């Protein structure tokens, strides 16, 4: 895995069974020394080349299973390990054009030993009041290439 949260490997358009491009995908790694349960994750807003992508257009694939943001919120059993990146799939008819694209995405998660005052202030779209990248509390940016 790469050091950056947004991984370059796996950034590509997605095709359906008829060969039509229905969107794109990219991978993110968990910047934490322990894994987390899906219910702990707080997905943020994705921007691609400055365009906002709505959360309902994104699914997360973890351990080979695909989840919506709503499904993750209530999943207390599925565990995301630090050694396995998640695949985020974005519904976008026609996908992305070949070339470079700027991705901006933040997510964070709760922790049992994180003080409540910090958990109450979690906003995956903004930098945290306390800089703690190990909790994913920062917005990630990366320029990636689709060929």
Curated annotation (Swiss-Prot):
Pfam families: CGDB. It comes from Eubacterium cellulosolvens (strain ATCC 43171 / JCM 9499 / 6) (Cillobacterium cellulosolvens). Its EC number is 4.1.99.-. This is C-glycoside deglycosidase beta subunit. The gene is dfgB. Its cofactor is Mn(2+). It catalyses: 3''-dehydroisoorientin = 1,5-anhydro-D-erythro-hex-1-en-3-ulose + luteolin; 3''-dehydroisovitexin = 1,5-anhydro-D-erythro-hex-1-en-3-ulose + apigenin. Can also use other divalent ions such as Ni(2+), Mg(2+), Zn(2+) and Ca(2+), but Mn(2+) is probably the native metal ion. Carbon-carbon bond-cleaving enzyme which participates in the metabolism of C-glycosides. Acts on the C6-glycosylated compounds 3''-dehydroisoorientin (3''-oxo-homoorientin) and 3''-dehydroisovitexin (3''-oxo-isovitexin).
């Amino acid at each position: 895995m790469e050091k950056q949260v947004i991984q370059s490997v796996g950034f590509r358009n997605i095709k359906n069974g008829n060969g039509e491009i229905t969107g794109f995908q990219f991978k993110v790694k968990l910047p934490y020394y322990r894994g987390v349960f899906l219910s702990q994750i707080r997905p943020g807003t994705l921007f691609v080349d400055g365009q906002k992508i709505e959360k309902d257009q994104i699914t997360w694939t973890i351990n080979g299973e695909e989840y919506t943001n709503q499904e993750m919120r209530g999943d207390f059993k599925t565990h995301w390990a630090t050694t396995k990146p998640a695949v985020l799939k974005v519904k976008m008819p026609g996908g992305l054009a070949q070339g470079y694209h700027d991705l901006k995405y933040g997510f964070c998660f709760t922790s049992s030993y994180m003080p409540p005052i910090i958990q109450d202030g979690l906003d995956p779209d903004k930098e945290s009041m306390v800089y703690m990248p190990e909790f994913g509390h920062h917005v990630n940016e990366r320029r990636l290439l689709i060929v």
